[in-house]
Amino acid sequence: MTLDAARLTADLIRCASVTPADDGALDVLERVLSQAGFSCTRVDRGGICNLFARWGDKGHARSFGFNGHTDVVPVGDAAAWTVAPFGAEEKDGFLYGRGATDMKSGVAAFVAAAVDLVTTTPPEGAVIVTITGDEEGDALDGTKALLDYMAASGERMSVCLVGEPTCPDRMGEMIKIGRRGSMTAWFTVTGVQGHSAYPHRAKNPLPAMARLMDRLASHGLDQGTDHFDPSTLAVVTIDTGNTATNVIPAQCRGAVNIRFNDLHSGASLTGWMQGEADRVAEEFGVAVEMKVKISGESFLTPPGELSDLVAAAVEAETGVTPVLSTSGGTSDARFVKDHCPVVEFGLVGRTMHQVDERVEIAQIHQLKAIYGRILRDFFA
């Protein structure tokens, strides 16, 4: 059985699965996988649709896993598109539509490669496919739910490949072997409102906020590591909601976003920021409240057997030697890393989340070939 990955991508694009909606995307995959002999289970939780599929024996010591998502971001202004966002139109060698790059093509390429493998040369082992509809959203009931189901059901993956688009410009140029952690901290500084002509009768929260933001932003977190760039902290907002120039506001709010490497944890950075907030509160005689959300901790899959396997397949199919990287934002690999070794590889992500998102059709077939080689080499 040979499955056309580009056609499957088009079928998925026609599902308007704007997160958290599914619009039949997982039904498309379940039908294809079931016909190839995969045991499929819906792992829906919290209104989110998820699919777990396994070919082969449960708990097999040699189990290759794949993780991806079928939910997509909103299309924005549909009138700005030159094609229907969910029409899966082909034009000049490209397939257009929301999710074409991120990441319905990656899901389709792996499913097609896996179906070809198990129906033509069944391996000694198991192939596991985990697909969520909650990667672009809050990511609370997506891959987390799938991993919870696996733990409770005795399912396991020896290794996992996440099919996010990892290549910035050229097919095959980059494999992700880790990701930086991400966290956001919100600060509220409370003083005493007053007339700007009588500042001694007020307690202005703005100088305190400015001092706090300066202390945080001017502090070099680290110099990076062998596999990670230096951690970064960005001031993303400072706001009082005050439009009156003769009023000293009572409150000021600010926020920072930190992308951190494995020299830090969310807890260690929270402790550092709380210490800075306490010092500023004491210096200015104001109250400083901090709230934190840790979206994900940093992680690294050290270069070795898994990254070598993927890199060899990429080079064999593209002629490009991939760089092992930890750059970019977060992905669901941050959850998978607690289950098994994980790396990420997919196609060029230049148009993801953009108007007229599109994927080169030849790249879909090339990605299927890469995934197929990875699977064959893993089970060899």
UniProtKB/Swiss-Prot annotation:
It comes from the Bacteria. PANTHER family: ACETYLORNITHINE DEACETYLASE, N-ACETYL-L-CITRULLINE DEACETYLASE. Zn(2+) 1 binds at H69, D102, E164. Binds 2 Zn(2+) or Co(2+) ions per subunit. Keywords: Amino-acid biosynthesis, Cobalt, Diaminopimelate biosynthesis, Hydrolase, Lysine biosynthesis, Metal-binding, Zinc. Zn(2+) 2 binds at D102, E136, H353. Its EC number is 3.5.1.18. Belongs to the peptidase M20A family. DapE subfamily. Homodimer. One of its GO terms (biological process) is L-arginine biosynthetic process. Catalyzes the hydrolysis of N-succinyl-L,L-diaminopimelic acid (SDAP), forming succinate and LL-2,6-diaminopimelate (DAP), an intermediate involved in the bacterial biosynthesis of lysine and meso-diaminopimelic acid, an essential component of bacterial cell walls. The keyword Coiled coil does not apply. It catalyses: N-succinyl-(2S,6S)-2,6-diaminopimelate + H2O = (2S,6S)-2,6-diaminopimelate + succinate. The gene is dapE. Pathway: Amino-acid biosynthesis; L-lysine biosynthesis via DAP pathway; LL-2,6-diaminopimelate from (S)-tetrahydrodipicolinate (succinylase route): step 3/3. The active site is at D71, E135. This is Succinyl-diaminopimelate desuccinylase. It comes from Ruegeria pomeroyi (strain ATCC 700808 / DSM 15171 / DSS-3). GO terms for molecular function: acetylornithine deacetylase activity; cobalt ion binding; succinyl-diaminopimelate desuccinylase activity; zinc ion binding. Its cofactor is Zn(2+); Co(2+). InterPro entries: ArgE/DapE_CS, Bact_exopeptidase_dim_dom, DapE_proteobac, Peptidase_M20, Peptidase_M20_dimer, Peptidase_M20A.
